[in-house]
Protein backbone atom coordinates (compact mmCIF):
# COMPACT_ATOMS: atom_id res chain seq x y z
CA UNK A 1 0.00 0.00 0.00
CA UNK A 2 1.00 3.60 -0.55
CA UNK A 3 0.79 5.69 2.60
CA UNK A 4 0.87 9.49 2.61
CA UNK A 5 1.74 11.16 5.92
CA UNK A 6 1.00 14.84 6.48
CA UNK A 7 2.74 16.36 9.52
CA UNK A 8 1.71 19.81 10.73
CA UNK A 9 3.27 20.50 14.13
CA UNK A 10 5.76 23.34 14.55
CA UNK A 11 7.65 21.33 17.21
CA UNK A 12 9.48 18.95 14.89
CA UNK A 13 10.75 15.82 16.63
CA UNK A 14 9.34 17.10 19.95
CA UNK A 15 5.83 16.97 18.50
CA UNK A 16 3.36 14.64 20.18
CA UNK A 17 1.32 14.23 17.00
CA UNK A 18 4.52 13.26 15.16
CA UNK A 19 5.24 10.68 17.86
CA UNK A 20 1.89 9.08 17.08
CA UNK A 21 2.66 9.10 13.36
CA UNK A 22 6.08 7.55 14.03
CA UNK A 23 4.44 4.83 16.11
CA UNK A 24 2.05 4.01 13.28
CA UNK A 25 4.85 4.00 10.70
CA UNK A 26 6.90 1.60 12.83
CA UNK A 27 3.95 -0.76 12.85
CA UNK A 28 3.43 -0.42 9.10
CA UNK A 29 7.11 -1.16 8.49
CA UNK A 30 6.58 -4.55 10.11
CA UNK A 31 3.14 -5.36 8.73
CA UNK A 32 3.62 -3.95 5.22
CA UNK A 33 7.29 -4.46 4.28
CA UNK A 34 6.48 -3.86 0.63
CA UNK A 35 4.55 -0.66 1.24
CA UNK A 36 5.74 2.83 0.41
CA UNK A 37 5.54 5.94 2.57
CA UNK A 38 5.67 9.58 1.53
CA UNK A 39 5.99 12.18 4.28
CA UNK A 40 5.17 15.87 3.88
CA UNK A 41 6.00 18.17 6.79
CA UNK A 42 3.95 21.36 6.54
CA UNK A 43 6.01 23.12 9.21
CA UNK A 44 9.43 22.29 7.75
CA UNK A 45 8.21 22.94 4.20
CA UNK A 46 5.24 25.34 4.56
CA UNK A 47 2.45 25.60 2.04
CA UNK A 48 1.90 29.28 1.15
CA UNK A 49 -1.23 30.88 2.53
CA UNK A 50 -3.97 31.64 0.07
CA UNK A 51 -3.87 35.09 -1.49
CA UNK A 52 -5.32 36.77 -4.54
CA UNK A 53 -2.58 35.46 -6.81
CA UNK A 54 -3.19 31.87 -5.67
CA UNK A 55 -6.93 32.09 -6.22
CA UNK A 56 -6.36 33.69 -9.60
CA UNK A 57 -3.99 30.94 -10.68
CA UNK A 58 -6.22 28.06 -9.58
CA UNK A 59 -9.34 29.52 -11.15
CA UNK A 60 -7.61 30.19 -14.45
CA UNK A 61 -7.83 27.28 -16.93
CA UNK A 62 -4.48 25.48 -17.12
CA UNK A 63 -4.02 26.30 -20.79
CA UNK A 64 -4.55 30.02 -20.12
CA UNK A 65 -2.15 30.43 -17.17
CA UNK A 66 0.88 32.64 -17.51
CA UNK A 67 4.29 31.52 -16.23
CA UNK A 68 3.76 32.85 -12.71
CA UNK A 69 0.31 31.26 -12.46
CA UNK A 70 1.74 27.95 -13.63
CA UNK A 71 4.36 28.14 -10.87
CA UNK A 72 1.73 28.89 -8.22
CA UNK A 73 -0.65 26.17 -9.40
CA UNK A 74 2.10 23.54 -9.57
CA UNK A 75 2.30 23.16 -5.79
CA UNK A 76 -1.44 22.72 -5.41
CA UNK A 77 -1.41 20.21 -8.25
CA UNK A 78 1.36 18.26 -6.49
CA UNK A 79 -0.56 18.19 -3.20
CA UNK A 80 -3.68 16.93 -4.93
CA UNK A 81 -1.74 14.32 -6.91
CA UNK A 82 -0.31 12.95 -3.65
CA UNK A 83 -3.82 12.49 -2.28
CA UNK A 84 -5.10 10.63 -5.29
CA UNK A 85 -1.98 8.45 -5.50
CA UNK A 86 -2.17 7.29 -1.87
CA UNK A 87 -4.12 4.30 -0.60
CA UNK A 88 -3.87 5.46 2.99
CA UNK A 89 -3.59 9.03 4.28
CA UNK A 90 -2.31 9.83 7.76
CA UNK A 91 -2.80 13.34 9.11
CA UNK A 92 -0.83 14.21 12.27
CA UNK A 93 -2.40 17.37 13.66
CA UNK A 94 -1.91 19.21 16.96
CA UNK A 95 -4.61 21.39 18.48
CA UNK A 96 -3.64 25.06 18.76
CA UNK A 97 -6.08 27.30 20.63
CA UNK A 98 -9.00 24.90 20.10
CA UNK A 99 -8.36 24.55 16.38
CA UNK A 100 -6.01 23.28 13.71
CA UNK A 101 -2.63 24.86 12.90
CA UNK A 102 -2.62 27.63 10.32
CA UNK A 103 -0.29 25.63 8.09
CA UNK A 104 -2.74 22.72 8.02
CA UNK A 105 -5.64 25.04 7.16
CA UNK A 106 -3.57 26.39 4.30
CA UNK A 107 -2.97 22.83 3.12
CA UNK A 108 -6.72 22.18 3.13
CA UNK A 109 -7.28 25.35 1.12
CA UNK A 110 -4.87 24.06 -1.52
CA UNK A 111 -6.44 20.60 -1.83
CA UNK A 112 -10.11 21.66 -1.73
CA UNK A 113 -10.56 22.45 -5.41
CA UNK A 114 -13.82 22.54 -7.30
CA UNK A 115 -13.78 20.21 -10.27
CA UNK A 116 -10.66 18.47 -8.97
CA UNK A 117 -11.23 17.09 -5.46
CA UNK A 118 -14.96 17.85 -5.34
CA UNK A 119 -17.70 18.83 -7.74
CA UNK A 120 -21.36 19.75 -7.75
CA UNK A 121 -23.93 17.46 -9.35
CA UNK A 122 -26.64 18.61 -11.73
CA UNK A 123 -28.89 18.87 -8.67
CA UNK A 124 -26.41 21.17 -6.98
CA UNK A 125 -25.23 18.64 -4.41
CA UNK A 126 -21.52 18.43 -3.57
CA UNK A 127 -19.72 15.22 -4.41
CA UNK A 128 -16.27 14.44 -3.03
CA UNK A 129 -13.83 12.96 -5.54
CA UNK A 130 -11.06 11.75 -3.20
CA UNK A 131 -12.70 8.39 -2.64
CA UNK A 132 -11.61 4.92 -1.55
CA UNK A 133 -8.94 6.11 0.89
CA UNK A 134 -8.15 4.90 4.38
CA UNK A 135 -7.71 8.01 6.50
CA UNK A 136 -6.24 8.16 9.98
CA UNK A 137 -6.36 11.46 11.87
CA UNK A 138 -3.81 11.53 14.70
CA UNK A 139 -4.45 14.43 17.05
CA UNK A 140 -2.45 15.77 20.00
CA UNK A 141 -4.35 17.99 22.42
CA UNK A 142 -3.07 19.88 25.45
CA UNK A 143 -6.26 19.43 27.44
CA UNK A 144 -9.01 16.84 27.54
CA UNK A 145 -11.95 17.92 25.40
CA UNK A 146 -12.72 14.95 23.14
CA UNK A 147 -16.48 14.66 22.70
CA UNK A 148 -17.21 18.01 24.35
CA UNK A 149 -18.23 21.40 22.88
CA UNK A 150 -14.65 22.57 23.42
CA UNK A 151 -13.50 20.18 20.69
CA UNK A 152 -14.23 22.45 17.75
CA UNK A 153 -11.57 20.96 15.48
CA UNK A 154 -12.86 17.40 15.09
CA UNK A 155 -16.31 18.32 13.69
CA UNK A 156 -14.70 20.65 11.15
CA UNK A 157 -12.22 18.00 10.01
CA UNK A 158 -14.95 15.37 9.72
CA UNK A 159 -17.05 17.71 7.59
CA UNK A 160 -14.14 18.81 5.40
CA UNK A 161 -12.83 15.31 4.75
CA UNK A 162 -16.30 13.99 3.95
CA UNK A 163 -16.86 16.94 1.61
CA UNK A 164 -13.78 15.82 -0.32
CA UNK A 165 -14.95 12.19 -0.41
CA UNK A 166 -12.91 10.77 2.47
CA UNK A 167 -15.43 8.90 4.61
CA UNK A 168 -13.34 5.99 5.96
CA UNK A 169 -11.78 8.14 8.68
CA UNK A 170 -10.57 7.11 12.13
CA UNK A 171 -9.74 9.75 14.75
CA UNK A 172 -7.24 8.97 17.50
CA UNK A 173 -6.35 11.70 19.99
CA UNK A 174 -3.61 11.90 22.59
CA UNK A 175 -5.08 14.15 25.27
CA UNK A 176 -3.63 15.88 28.30
CA UNK A 177 -0.35 16.80 26.65
CA UNK A 178 -0.13 20.07 28.61
CA UNK A 179 -1.46 18.71 31.91
CA UNK A 180 1.80 17.49 33.38
CA UNK A 181 4.26 14.73 32.55
CA UNK A 182 2.17 11.89 33.95
CA UNK A 183 -0.99 12.95 32.09
CA UNK A 184 0.98 13.36 28.88
CA UNK A 185 2.54 9.92 29.20
CA UNK A 186 -0.85 8.37 29.88
CA UNK A 187 -2.42 10.19 26.94
CA UNK A 188 0.28 9.06 24.53
CA UNK A 189 0.17 5.49 25.82
CA UNK A 190 -3.60 5.30 25.33
CA UNK A 191 -3.35 6.71 21.81
CA UNK A 192 -0.62 4.22 20.93
CA UNK A 193 -2.81 1.40 22.22
CA UNK A 194 -5.62 2.56 19.96
CA UNK A 195 -3.24 2.64 17.01
CA UNK A 196 -2.07 -0.89 17.80
CA UNK A 197 -5.70 -2.06 17.95
CA UNK A 198 -6.45 -0.90 14.42
CA UNK A 199 -7.00 -3.27 11.54
CA UNK A 200 -5.20 -1.70 8.61
CA UNK A 201 -6.40 -4.15 5.96
CA UNK A 202 -6.91 -2.16 2.77
CA UNK A 203 -9.83 -4.36 1.79
CA UNK A 204 -11.72 -3.76 5.02
CA UNK A 205 -10.88 -0.15 5.85
CA UNK A 206 -9.80 1.13 9.21
CA UNK A 207 -11.51 -0.56 12.11
CA UNK A 208 -10.78 -1.63 15.62
CA UNK A 209 -9.37 -5.13 15.65
Curated annotation (Swiss-Prot):
Quinone reductase that provides resistance to thiol-specific stress caused by electrophilic quinones. Its cofactor is FMN. Its EC number is 1.6.5.-, 1.7.1.17. This is FMN-dependent NADH:quinone oxidoreductase. Binds 1 FMN per subunit. It comes from the Bacteria. It holds the Pfam family Flavodoxin_2.
Amino acid sequence: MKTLVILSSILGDRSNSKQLADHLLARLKQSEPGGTVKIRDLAADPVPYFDGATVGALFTPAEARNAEQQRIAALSDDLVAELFDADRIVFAVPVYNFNLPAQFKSYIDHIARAGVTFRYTAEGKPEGLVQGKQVLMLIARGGKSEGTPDDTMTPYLKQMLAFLGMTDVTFIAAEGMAMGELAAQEGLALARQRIDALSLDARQGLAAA
